[in-house]
A protein has these predicted regions:
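Periplasmic c-type cytochrome electron-transfer domains
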Residues: 2, 12, 23, 40-224
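Bacterial N-terminal signal peptides that target proteins for export
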Residues: 5-31
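Bacterial N-terminal signal peptides
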Residues: 28-40
Length: 224
């Protein structure tokens, strides 16, 4: 897993999953690319405001690389990580707060953010374990890629430049042409795209379910 931890990436993941849930029969599959299964969300303790972009939002994550089962168990035992978070925008941008959507149905928590971070940088979501979300949306390159088009498995070139994934919580429309109406709708595509990650939804669900670190997080956060 690529080393990194960033609130904006994690917020992107902690949003997504209504469309995924509707598309997959197996409940855990909703988390193949993103980190929220709304129907099975665990009870959260309400009430903490966090500044969008503040590094404190990801403070205390169990690690920035591969995480052990004992580490994640300790993390999941901390009820603070299940406190419901309300993101607010920095001074001067507060008028944009009305554009933050989806959190009423899908409360944001540090536990979801951390799971999303792990998935974002994990190439095992692709069929040959070579391409992660961060491969085409790299934080060190402004959450995009310095190539003409996105590059997927086996070096295949996509049809368009990779759009910036930074702070996507502020927009419902996704992709350059806006064809996806939400992050939830967008998130189910890349894994099964033969050029991008080349996997199947069923295959990635089975793979994630076989990994104890992921299985424990899904069970504790979503009950499945």
């Amino acid at each position: 897993m690529k080393e990194n931890s960033n609130m904006n990436v994690s917020t992107f993941f902690a949003r997504a999953d209504r469309t995924t849930r509707a598309s997959f029969a197996v409940r855990i599959c909703c988390f193949t690319l993103v980190t929220v299964l709304l129907t099975f969300s665990s009870a959260s303790v309400r009430g903490e405001q966090v500044l969008l972009g503040d590094p404190a939002l990801t403070s205390g994550v169990p690690g920035s690389g591969p995480i052990s089962v004992p580490q994640i168990e300790t993390w999941l035992d901390d009820e603070h990580n299940f406190t419901e978070l309300t993101p607010v925008l920095p001074l001067g941008l507060s008028q944009g707060s009305s554009q933050i959507t989806g959190l009423d149905e899908n409360p944001l928590t540090r536990a979801k953010i951390e799971l999303g971070r792990q998935l974002y940088f994990d190439p095992r979501l692709s069929v040959d374990s070579t391409v992660s979300c961060a491969s085409c949306h790299d934080p060190s390159m402004g959450y995009t890629a310095q190539t003409k088009t996105g590059i997927g498995i086996k070096g295949q070139a996509g049809g368009r430049n990779s759009p910036v994934s930074f702070n996507r919580i502020l927009s419902d429309k996704q992709f350059w042409d806006g064809r996806a109406g939400s992050l939830e709708e967008q998130a189910i595509g890349p894994i099964a795209n033969p050029i991008e990650m080349g996997f199947t939804h069923e295959g990635v669900v089975k793979r994630l379910a076989s990994m104890p670190v992921y299985a424990k997080q899904f069970e504790k956060i979503f009950g499945s």
